[in-house]
């Protein structure tokens, strides 16, 4: 049993690509947690998608054993967290399990938007902050200027910030020494009843549901009967251990420690992230506060390409939700696509990652509908309803008004790109709140409609600023807007999967653009196909796919013109009849094209 005073629990937080995972690699390497042949880049990024994209998606934990200069052996529980705003929920769960944070800042880039967002979360959790300036070996690094920037922008003392280069291993011992001397040990009563926080869970085909816990009071050991406080489900603990980063069976976890527990849990719904776990025989008197779940902000429909795969998709979504608590889904049906699920995500990257994981890990082939956000619809009757699926929107004459979600966006950019970014924000219906300058960089605060930023705002921001802009946002409020439903009709029949809710000023552009895309993607038939964009009963854009022509005169070598005319009239009548009864098959690529429409001038 390790003394509680010799345990340190800390999270590594930073903006995207400031070196969190590389620093975690160096700490693991220095503590000899893995042999040299087992080390690789981003060793804690276990998913293929993480390695390919070079980003952290899942927060990971590892226990390191470090012998300090004072001769004592310390157990360091490190949690590597994602930097992207779409995975902020992973960060909040990691912070709830720790007492302190390493704030990593790139010495060449300085303070970025997500640096601030993650730091404020850590401060809200009463964390002790240790500032680490990374990449000081780069020619563009300016540690003194970044220290000043941290003090000016964030308002915390950076005079004793640690100077390191995680890539070449410079200053790693200083970081470890600072962790054991400056960061606090966990609080908690080792003699009290068991009280543990459920941080994460995932599904294992052999072990059932595996849960990751932080023991706040007491201890959890093999053979113990544990109870989930949210639903009173009781299980017998089969195995207890920790990650080093390989899985190690210890048989017991004491106060302040972080590790995994298996208990033959088969019900996915029994494990709710943020739940309190206690001893079934001697339950704790008060449950832990947990943490507030992030509400999804982007919604889309997921449908199996083959209807027989519906149950497989349902099982896959349930297993994935166990591993990603910020993702939500509910069953729905569509006239064009059949049975599927309406899913909620924290952003467009989150949507992309979930879709890719479903395809890779569960071998699913799916159709994804256009993303939308949650709107508040005020009816003439006085009732207020939430709508995130355009197909559920009532008729326009029944609607008094509609409100859409607005966000407060914080953007950091070098001065020379300010004009282009101000133009982009104005184009997206933004309202400027604040503009300040710090050491040659501008900090912009804008209010923007969420519907405008979920599609292509981030891509355009990076393009306009040559990749130098950083961006973070948080929900602000709902505001009344002139919103309408844009319907797409193919051959006179509405396709509900392609309908969207848009601002009236953008409706004509989006309708025309979508009709053009569909004209290129829907194959020609033996009859003419009309593709129309409509607002209510008014058509605002139209494209026509010409009919394939069968040459009925091929066998007529000369002869009377009336014979040819008779054959052409017969073909014309047949095409007219076919247009009335024929079905148009819309390929999957047409639905995917709806995602890629950008507001180009």
From Swiss-Prot:
Transmembrane segments: none annotated. Its main location: membrane. One of its GO terms (biological process) is positive regulation of translation. Residues 5-187 form the tr-type G domain. It is a peripheral membrane protein. Gene3D superfamilies: 3.30.70.240, Elongation factor 4, C-terminal domain, Elongation Factor G (Translational Gtpase), domain 3, P-loop containing nucleotide triphosphate hydrolases, Translation factors. It is an enzyme of class 3 (hydrolase). It holds the Pfam family GTP_EFTU_D2. It is found in: Cell inner membrane. It comes from the Bacteria. It catalyses: GTP + H2O = GDP + phosphate + H(+). The keyword Iron does not apply. GO terms for cellular component: plasma membrane. Its EC number is 3.6.5.n1. Keywords: Cell inner membrane, Cell membrane, GTP-binding, Hydrolase, Membrane, Nucleotide-binding, Protein biosynthesis. GTP binds at residues 17-22, 134-137. GO terms for molecular function: GTP binding; GTPase activity; guanosine tetraphosphate binding; ribosome binding; translation elongation factor activity. Required for accurate and efficient protein synthesis under certain stress conditions. May act as a fidelity factor of the translation reaction, by catalyzing a one-codon backward translocation of tRNAs on improperly translocated ribosomes. Back-translocation proceeds from a post-translocation (POST) complex to a pre-translocation (PRE) complex, thus giving elongation factor G a second chance to translocate the tRNAs correctly. Binds to ribosomes in a GTP-dependent manner. Belongs to the TRAFAC class translation factor GTPase superfamily. Classic translation factor GTPase family. LepA subfamily. NCBIfam families: lepA, small_GTP. HAMAP family: LepA. This is Elongation factor 4. It comes from Orientia tsutsugamushi (strain Ikeda).
């Amino acid at each position: 049993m390790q003394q509680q005073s010799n345990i340190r629990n800390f999270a590594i937080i930073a903006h995207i690509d400031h070196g969190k995972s590389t620093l975690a690699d160096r700490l693991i390497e220095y503590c000899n947690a893995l042999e040299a042949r087992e080390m690789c880049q981003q060793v804690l990024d276990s998913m293929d998608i993480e390695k390919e994209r070079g980003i952290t998606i899942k927060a990971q934990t590892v226990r390191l054993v470090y012998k300090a200069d004072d001769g004592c052996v310390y157990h360091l529980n490190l949690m590597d967290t994602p930097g992207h705003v779409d995975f902020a929920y992973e960060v909040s769960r990691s912070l709830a399990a720790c007492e302190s944070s390493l704030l990593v800042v790139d010495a060449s880039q300085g303070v970025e938007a997500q640096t601030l967002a993650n730091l404020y979360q850590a401060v809200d959790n009463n964390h002790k902050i240790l500032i680490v300036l990374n990449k000081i070996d780069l020619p563009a690094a300016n540690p003194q200027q970044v220290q000043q920037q941290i003090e000016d922008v964030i308002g915390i003392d950076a005079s004793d910030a640690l100077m390191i280069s995680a890539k070449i291993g410079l200053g790693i011992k200083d970081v470890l020494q600072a962790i054991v001397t400056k960061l606090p040990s966990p609080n908690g009563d080792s003699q009290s009843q068991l009280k543990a926080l459920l941080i994460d869970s995932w599904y294992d085909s052999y072990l059932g549901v595996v849960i990751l816990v932080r023991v706040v009071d007491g201890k959890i050991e093999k053979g113990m009967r544990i109870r989930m406080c949210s639903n009173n489900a009781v299980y017998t603990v089969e195995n207890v251990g920790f990650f080093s980063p390989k899985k190690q069976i210890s048989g017991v976890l004491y106060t302040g420690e972080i590790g995994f527990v298996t208990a033959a849990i088969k019900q996915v719904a029994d494990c709710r992230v943020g739940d309190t776990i206690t001893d079934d025989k001697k339950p704790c008197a008060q449950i832990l506060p947990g943490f507030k779940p992030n509400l999804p902000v982007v919604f889309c429909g997921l449908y199996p390409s083959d209807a027989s795969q519906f149950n497989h998709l349902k099982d896959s979504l349930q297993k994935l939700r166990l591993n990603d608590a910020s993702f939500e889904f509910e069953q729905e049906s569509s006239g064009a696509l059949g049975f599927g699920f309406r899913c909620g995500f924290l952003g467009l990257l989150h949507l992309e990652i979930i879709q890719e994981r479903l395809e890779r890990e569960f071998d699913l082939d799916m159709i994804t509908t256009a993303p939308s956000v949650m709107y508040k619809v005020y009816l003439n009757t006085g009732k207020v309803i939430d709508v995130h699926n355009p197909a559920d929107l009532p008729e326009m004459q029944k609607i008094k008004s509609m409100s859409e979600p607005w966000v407060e966006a914080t953007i950091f950019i070098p001065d020379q790109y300010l004009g282009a970014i101000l133009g982009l924000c104005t184009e997206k219906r933004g309202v400027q709140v604040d503009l300040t300058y710090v050491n040659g960089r501008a900090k912009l605060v804008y209010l923007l409609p969420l519907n405008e930023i979920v599609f292509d705002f981030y891509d355009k921001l990076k393009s306009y600023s040559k990749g130098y802009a950083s961006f973070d946002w948080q929900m602000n409020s709902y505001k009344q807007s002139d919103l309408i439903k844009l319907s797409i009709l193919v051959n006179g029949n509405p396709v509900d999967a392609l309908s969207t809710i848009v601002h009236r000023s953008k409706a004509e552009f989006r309708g025309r653009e979508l009709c053009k895309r569909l004209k290129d993607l829907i194959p020609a038939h033996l009859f003419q196909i009309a593709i129309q964009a409509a607002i209510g009963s008014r058509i605002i854009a139209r494209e026509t796919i010409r009919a394939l022509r069968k040459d009925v005169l091929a066998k007529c070598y000369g002869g009377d013109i009336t014979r040819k005319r008779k054959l052409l009239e017969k073909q014309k009548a047949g095409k007219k009849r076919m247009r009335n009864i024929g079905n148009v098959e819309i390929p999957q690529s047409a639905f995917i094209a709806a995602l890629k429409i950008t507001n180009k001038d």
